[in-house]
Amino acid sequence: MITITITLGVNYLRPNSWPSHYDSVVLITSIGCKSSPTQTVGTVIGKDLIVTVAHGVAGQTSTSITTVSGQVLNAKVVAIDINLDLALIYVDSAKSTTKLLPLKFGDAVAGSETRFVAFEDSQQFAISAKIKEILRIVTEDIYLKNKISRPGLKIKTRVVVGNSGGPLINHKSEIVGLVWATSRTEKNLAWATRIEATDKLLALISSRNPQSATPQVVACSG
């Protein structure tokens, strides 16, 4: 499988139409343990909390986000799960000139159309992503050492390197999953983790003071 990056956000336009962009989806840049910066995508899911993929931030010494308006804000990893390939990042949203409103969780529906949100050349895009199947995905942890099982989604959309963490957003502007890999053998086939898997990480931190959390120390991935 090939990893990918995605972005999400919320910006309502007219009824019965998909938003042109999502303010709640941000670009994440991490540095410290690789020869070049690692970029992934994150989505605001709580006050000052962003969810993304673990393999992009694991072992890094510095992380920041870039909003759709181009503003860069410092961020901090507060929880990480190397088996689910998920991480929570804290950012002081009060400093953002863009409203970073949390997206609600939604249930994935097989056969439904969603929007996959990510970035290309620092510009956010949102494209069609159809949910083909809801399943358990047998894969490996982010270090490719141990076999694990994740609540997953098989989706049809175009994903490239750097899109990892990009959300799948339904017509209600709810997040239903995070893309983390694309197929090496079938064109426009990708894999996502269902958003309810994030509940395990959310239970580890304080909703009132998330920045106080200290995640487990993990090595660089990839």
Roles of regions detected by a PLM:
Residues 21-29, 92-100, 125-208, 214-215:
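Active-site region of chymotrypsin-like
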Residues 37, 48-126, 208-209:
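Conserved active-site neighborhood of the chymotrypsin/trypsin-like protease fold
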Residues 82-85, 186, 221:
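Short acidic/glycine-enriched loop/turn segments that link adjacent beta-strands
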Residues 43-45, 76-78, 132, 160:
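Conserved positions in beta-strands of structured domains
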Residues 33-34, 121-122, 185:
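Short glycine/acidic-enriched loop and turn motifs that connect beta-strands
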Residues 1-19, 208-222:
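N-terminal targeting leaders that route proteins to membranes or the secretory/organellar pathways
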Residues 12-15, 25-47, 53, 71-74, ...:
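A conserved glycine-rich beta-strand in the N-terminal activation segment of trypsin-fold
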